[in-house]
UniProtKB/Swiss-Prot annotation:
Keyword Membrane: no
InterPro entries per the UniProt record, alphabetical: Rbsml_uS13_C, Ribosomal_uS13, Ribosomal_uS13-like_H2TH, Ribosomal_uS13_bac-type, Ribosomal_uS13_CS
Family: Belongs to the universal ribosomal protein uS13 family.
Family matches, as HAMAP family: Ribosomal_uS13 (MF_01315)
Region of interest: Disordered: 99-122
Name recorded for this polypeptide: Small ribosomal subunit protein uS13
Functional note: Located at the top of the head of the 30S subunit, it contacts several helices of the 16S rRNA. In the 70S ribosome it contacts the 23S rRNA (bridge B1a) and protein L5 of the 50S subunit (bridge B1b), connecting the 2 subunits; these bridges are implicated in subunit movement. Contacts the tRNAs in the A and P-sites.
GO cellular component: cytosol; small ribosomal subunit
GO molecular function: rRNA binding; structural constituent of ribosome; tRNA binding
Length: 122
């Protein structure tokens, strides 16, 4: 099992699919990495040589922000918005949708489970 960017890559999958197990690498980035390293698209991870795995590691380390670094940067960006006190920061702080979605109904994923409100007594 190859280990790239701190992630165990599944050995029986194609390299294009296996690279997407790394946080921060999607379809497009995986295809770009394969193209840079000049690996055939249909090659599987267990067919890669150690030199090819090393080349993939070098390309990812040099050109892409992945895993912990990406998560840290995303968290820092959200924290910066909250510290600024801008509208987006306030929405993050309150746990509400940030990008203008309606909240009268829906938005349950972001707001959490519905809180029961006592009904009118007769």
């Amino acid at each position: 099992m190859a280990r790239i960017a701190g992630v165990n890559i599944p050995t029986n999958k194609r390299v294009l699919i296996a690279l997407q197990y790394i946080h921060g690498i999607g379809q497009k980035n995986a295809a770009d990495i394969i193209e840079k390293v000049k690996i055939p698209v249909d090659r599987r991870v267990n067919q890669l040589s150690d030199a090819e795995v090393l080349q993939i590691r070098e390309v990812i380390d040099r050109d892409y922000l992945v895993e912990g670094d990406l998560r840290r940067e995303t968290g820092m960006n959200i924290k910066r918005l909250m510290d600024l006190g801008c509208y987006r920061g306030l929405r993050h702080r309150r746990g509400l949708p940030v990008r203008g979605q309606r909240t009268h109904t829906n938005a349950r994923t972001r707001k959490g489970p519905a809180k029961a409100i006592a009904g009118k007594k007769k």
